């Protein structure tokens, strides 16, 4: 699943081709994604793309005729190509075509993403309920400690909750907890202030590093330039069940926590009894 670094990578990849451009047409081949594609998108001819931004895992195109919210879902990706360069494939559901012949193509085999129109993205219900950005100054140890009080949920589920902090998906949650030395099943309310300081620090480090390296190379993620990301080459625990921990040599274990596979080192991440 594309996570925050993948969406940030997509934003940086497509922005040079779309910023300041005039929309010629938006071609919708599949109306039903996670939510129905907004009808308004097919009436945006002449709209100028004045800015592009990201909030959590939503890519936002700000235009003179409202904002377009794009979510990549479980397997979505964005590509840039020239108009008529390549016929649309089976899973190419939406094309945004600019007047100068550039195409933003949305591919999604599982059809679990979205393309929505809204007058103002900041006021859309999908955006207003989100927690702080993990790389922002709002995401601090003091904030995380305060939000964790009386929370009996496992710390892994806690940091993956978008109401608490956005964009810490399964891969990066596993990696961050390993680097912080915290067992994924530790109750959030048992976090100490010092542990929160460490956890916030490594979450920021892991995500920043992944963005620099282009996101995580998984079968469903391709960068807008067609190249894979490279962060998977340095994953410490995620997807490494049965392999030796790079720090201590103990065998990495996996367990389903909150309906997600969670990877951890039982020696480096001890669950207090």
Swiss-Prot record:
Cofactor binding: number and manner: Binds 1 zinc ion per subunit.
A GO BP annotation: base-excision repair
Superkingdom of origin organism: Bacteria
Keyword Hydrolase: yes
Reactions accelerated catalytically: Hydrolysis of DNA containing ring-opened 7-methylguanine residues, releasing 2,6-diamino-4-hydroxy-5-(N-methyl)formamidopyrimidine; 2'-deoxyribonucleotide-(2'-deoxyribose 5'-phosphate)-2'-deoxyribonucleotide-DNA = a 3'-end 2'-deoxyribonucleotide-(2,3-dehydro-2,3-deoxyribose 5'-phosphate)-DNA + a 5'-end 5'-phospho-2'-deoxyribonucleoside-DNA + H(+)
Keywords annotated in UniProt: DNA damage, DNA repair, DNA-binding, Glycosidase, Hydrolase, Lyase, Metal-binding, Multifunctional enzyme, Zinc, Zinc-finger
Residues annotated as the enzyme's active site: 2-3, 57, 260
EC number: 3.2.2.23, 4.2.99.18
Zinc finger (FPG-type): 236-270
CDD domains assigned: EcFpg-like_N (cd08966)
GO molecular function: 8-oxo-7,8-dihydroguanine DNA N-glycosylase activity; class I DNA-(apurinic or apyrimidinic site) endonuclease activity; damaged DNA binding; zinc ion binding
Gene3D superfamilies: 1.10.8.50, MutM-like, N-terminal
Cofactor(s) demanded: Zn(2+)
Entry-linked InterPro entries: DNA_glyclase/AP_lyase_DNA-bd, DNA_glyclase_Znf_dom_DNA_BS, Formamido-pyr_DNA_Glyclase, FPG_cat, MutM-like_N-ter, Ribosomal_uS13-like_H2TH, Znf_DNA_glyclase/AP_lyase, Znf_FPG/IleRS
Residues annotated as binding DNA: 91, 110, 151
Pfam families for this protein: Fapy_DNA_glyco, H2TH, zf-FPG_IleRS
Subunit structure: Monomer.
PANTHER family according to UniProt: FORMAMIDOPYRIMIDINE-DNA GLYCOSYLASE
Protein task: Involved in base excision repair of DNA damaged by oxidation or by mutagenic agents. Acts as a DNA glycosylase that recognizes and removes damaged bases. Has a preference for oxidized purines, such as 7,8-dihydro-8-oxoguanine (8-oxoG). Has AP (apurinic/apyrimidinic) lyase activity and introduces nicks in the DNA strand. Cleaves the DNA backbone by beta-delta elimination to generate a single-strand break at the site of the removed base with both 3'- and 5'-phosphates.
Similarity comment: family membership: Belongs to the FPG family.
NCBIfam families given in the database record: fpg, PRK01103.1
Name listed for the protein in its UniProt record: Formamidopyrimidine-DNA glycosylase
Organism of this sequence: Actinobacillus pleuropneumoniae serotype 7 (strain AP76)
Gene: mutM
């Amino acid at each position: 699943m594309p996570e925050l670094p993948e969406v940030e990578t997509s934003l940086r990849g497509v922005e040079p081709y779309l910023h300041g451009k005039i929309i010629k047409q938006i071609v919708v081949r599949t109306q039903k994604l996670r939510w129905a594609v907004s009808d308004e998108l097919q009436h945006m001819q002449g709209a100028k793309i004045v800015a592009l931004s990201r909030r959590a895992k939503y890519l936002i195109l700000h235009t003179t005729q409202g904002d377009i919210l794009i979510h990549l879902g479980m397997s979505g990706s964005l590509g840039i190509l020239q108009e008529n360069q390549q016929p649309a494939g089976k899973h190419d559901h939406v094309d945004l075509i600019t007047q100068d012949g550039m195409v933003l193509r949305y591919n999604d085999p599982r059809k679990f993403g979205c393309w929505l129109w809204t007058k103002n993205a900041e006021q859309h219900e999908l955006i207003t309920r989100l927690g702080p950005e993990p790389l922002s100054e709002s995401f601090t140890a003091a904030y995380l400690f305060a939000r964790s009080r009386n929370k009996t949920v496992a710390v892994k589920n806690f940091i993956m909750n978008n109401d608490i902090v956005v964009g810490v998906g399964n891969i990066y949650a596993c990696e961050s907890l390993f680097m912080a030395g915290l067992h994924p099943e530790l109750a959030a309310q048992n976090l100490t202030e010092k542990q929160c300081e460490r956890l916030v620090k490594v979450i920021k480090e892991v995500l920043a590093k992944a963005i620099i390296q282009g996101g995580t190379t998984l079968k469903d993620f391709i960068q807008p330039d067609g190249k894979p990301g490279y962060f998977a080459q340095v994953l410490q625990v995620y997807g490494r069940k049965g392999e030796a921990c790079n720090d201590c040599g103990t065998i990495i274990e996996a367990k389903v926590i909150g309906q997600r596979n969670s990877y951890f080192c039982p020696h480096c991440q001890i669950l207090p009894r």
